[in-house]
A protein has these predicted regions:
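Sec-dependent N-terminal signal peptides
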Residues: 3-13
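C-terminal motif of bacterial Sec signal peptides marking the signal peptidase cleavage site
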Residues: 17-21
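A residue-level marker of the well-folded mature domains of exported/periplasmic proteins
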Residues: 3-5, 22-360
Length: 360
């Protein structure tokens, strides 16, 4: 699907909102489903939007809803936000999306749990001429014209940032015998997680090869099958083991992380979102293996929930990559308003940034 172009998204009101939003502390926001009804500025004509998020199980999504609410306040629009209990509840989310379409709103913002499961509903939205803006996760194979814009972090770049910081921290341990690096991804179905996981894998392989080391990627078939010129497991300098739990919970991510961390050759771990990073930290509560000392497993996380930030601050994690769910939710409402006003849309990319104990 060729992506369309958003020529007019950033009006003066949005620039003000961006500056205000960047100063907000979205990580600890607590929200509930329901309408956000406000009176604000902007050529909104009283639009009503439906928003379907991945879940409300983490502070990440609570921050996204805070951004949605902020944009509604500024534009004078309303938004009803729903989402399943967990990001692995794909069928529940599809039902919520179908219900949203049946309400014939002025637009729908969607953060898809599974990029393939929403193709049918997106076709229906297209037929009903309901604009859809995807945020947090794109839907690359969406029916042509169904998705007006996508507001996402450059997830491949963001995953690569973690590799760029983990690799130099463990480089001196390479070439002295086979070692293992673990990656825990909460799923293999959503575009953002899969792109982020592959971003870490590809960047790590690139850095290792540049220094003359070989890498063999093992574990979850979805990720292994995307690796080009995968190394030989028997002879590789580094085994990069990728694990995906059966469901997207911290507890199951912790089980996967424990399995890798208990192996004697493991020297590094990466949890590619808040749930999986907290899973790595939960595993460490029993194992006490994470840290930056020579005898510890170096680990990095993703997102900026309070548990992850505390682990970065005390040195349990080397650092983490952060993004702004608040601003993605915020941009999504502005994009829907622009679409409802007949403006042309383009994708809105946002970047990931590294933080550690020195720059928190």
């Amino acid at each position: 699907m060729k992506k369309k172009v958003l020529a007019v998204l950033l009006g003066g009101c949005m620039v003000v909102g961006m500056l205000a939003g960047c100063g907000s502390n979205g990580g600890d926001t607590k929200t509930t489903d329901g309408d956000t009804k406000t009176e604000g500025s902007g050529d909104s004509k009283g639009y009503h939007f439906e928003v379907v998020v991945k879940s409300f199980q983490s502070s990440y999504w609570q921050a996204a809803v805070q951004g949605i609410n902020q944009a509604c306040d500024e534009l004078g629009v309303t938004a009803n936000t729903t989402g399943p209990n967990a990001e692995s509840d794909i069928a529940d989310q599809v039902n919520m999306l179908n219900n949203a379409i049946n309400k014939n709103p002025d637009g729908i913002a969607l953060a898809a749990c599974d990029q393939n499961s929403v193709l049918g509903p997106l076709k229906t939205a297209l037929e009903k001429k309901i604009p859809v803006v995807c945020f947090d996760s794109g839907v690359p194979d969406a029916p042509e014209g169904s998705v007006y814009a996508t507001v996402v972090t450059d997830n491949e770049q963001a995953g690569g940032i973690a590799a760029e910081h983990i690799y130099p921290a463990i480089k001196d341990k390479l070439g002295k015998g086979q070692v293992r690096v673990g990656e825990v991804n909460q799923d293999a179905t959503s575009a953002n997680i899969s792109e982020r996981g592959m971003g870490f894998i590809n960047k790590f392989i690139e850095l290792a090869k540049a220094d003359g080391f070989t890498v063999a990627v093992v574990g979850n078939d979805f990720y292994v099958n995307q690796v080009k010129d995968n190394g030989d497991q028997a002879s590789a300098d580094v085994i990069l083991e990728v694990a995906v739990p059966a469901q997207t919970t911290v507890e199951l991510c912790a089980t996967e992380a424990s399995n890798i961390m208990n192996k004697d050759d493991t020297i590094a771990m990466f949890g590619s979102n808040q749930v999986s990073a907290e899973g790595v930290l939960t595993a460490n509560q029993n194992l006490n293996k994470l840290g930056t000392d020579d005898d510890k497993i170096v680990a990095a996380g993703f997102d900026a929930g309070s548990v992850i930030k505390a682990a970065v601050k005390d040195g349990t994690l080397l650092g983490a990559v952060t993004q702004s769910p608040l601003m993605m939710g915020y941009y999504a409402i502005y994009a829907l308003t622009a679409a409802a006003n007949g403006q042309k849309l383009e994708d809105v990319p946002t970047e990931g940034y590294w933080y550690d104990a020195t720059n928190m």
